[in-house]
Amino acid sequence: MKVILANPRGLCAGVNMAIDVVDQLLDICTDEKICVYHEIVHNRHVVSRFVDRGVTFVESIAEVPDGAIVVFSAHGVSPAIRQEARDRNLTAVDATCPLVTKVHAEAIRYSKRGWQILLVGHADHQEVIGTRGEAPDAIQVVESPEDIPHLRIEDPAKLVYLTQTTLSTDDANVIIDALKEAFPEIKAPPGGDICYATTNRQKAVRALAPACDLVLVVGSRNSSNSVRLTEISENVGTAARLIDDLSEIEDHWFDDVKKLLVTAGASAPDDLVNDLVIHLVERFGGEVEQWDVDHETVEFGLPGSLKTVMRDRGIDPSGRRIVIDQSAELHEILDSRGIPHTTVDLTIGASG
């Protein structure tokens, strides 16, 4: 069986930043209680590993003990949550993905100008809850084209749509096209809102899945972008399974599978993918090929609130960046085990 690794896959820069924020707080605030508001990212393994290191995850600021540090997750929070933390004089560290922050800024800007905002996304997703909280009187959530007849529009000439960053581009475009048909004057967000990592991982599956017999997506079931990857594979005609880790696979899945595509959601740690690939090759034989559909060269700076915590404790944060390079580690592991592997370059450039 040939195991094909989709590239890009797995951790994005925003998730890496959020995980790094908690890692660094654990290293420098050894005698302080660290809480995270909501799951830092939507991955069971990431959360459980932090719990094992003493982090407490909460669903309300009231659960945070006095004097503790509270971290806002990668999905972002509403102004009301930030104010609640300030009212309690908690040390708050913001690990919101910068691309989510961009959507928040757009919501604030358009609402201040008196525009109505149609937010395309899942109403119960933490990111949408946080964005909606920036301008609750101006924002209406649109989950499907069926919601459009029920929208309350005052002036179609002052109407803009924004989107949840982790949506399937296919699903989002269906809703956006329906909005444009219903409201021809509706304005699009500058540069689009669906993040580069979501787009690239979906593009890779859309391009590679038709050449494969089965797709395995590593990710948790509450990860929106991971679920979307399985749906995209199925939409192009290739069966797909979403797994948290290799413990969930069953041997009969691979009967008659000659080409297996492996990818991962943007919140799935690299070691889960690495362990899966090694297990598959050692169990079923074969070789590994990485098929590069895009090259991501993305890095984020540390959040300002984390820099403040570091400086307050005598640590200089200068020059620190969050950089992604997931392929090198896996190639080294495969080499060390003598597993044949090659890279196929299908790219037409770099993105992100």
Language-model-derived ranges and their functions:
Residues 1-264, 270-330:
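The feature marks the mature, well-folded catalytic cores of soluble enzymes
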